Amino acid sequence: HERAFFQYEALIVDKDISFSSGMVMIQTIFEKVFGKKINVRMREGFFPFTEPGYEIDMECLVCGGKGCSVCNHNGWIEVMPGGVIHPNVLKSANLDPEEWTGFYINIGLDRLVMMRYGVDDVRLFHSADLRFLEQFK
């Protein structure tokens, strides 16, 4: 984790949004960013605005899921928290949680860019190394 980071929050709210709807949203984003289907896994996590909440990982594209220093040798990289929106969040938006549901994600953009371009160290994005930074013009 870095002191400064960039994130993108997304949520969908409707009358029949489910965990499956959230997975479709995640897969669609990944397919648009990477141009292919990406293996995703969900681990239980706690976030006060979701119920249930998940840590969402993607297969490490630097090593193809085989394990490397980028993914801590386990083949996966954590890219976002997310989950089904907590009923209290819906209530605060004047939505009846008996009628409305939603799914929320918070994408770590630095990590997606790392995977998209095969960058092996997130700290490079915040460095003053112009040789590295200028390749993203």
Regions found by a protein language model. Give the residues of each.
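TRNA-recognition modules of translation machinery and tRNA-sensing kinases, especially anticodon-binding
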Residues: 1-137
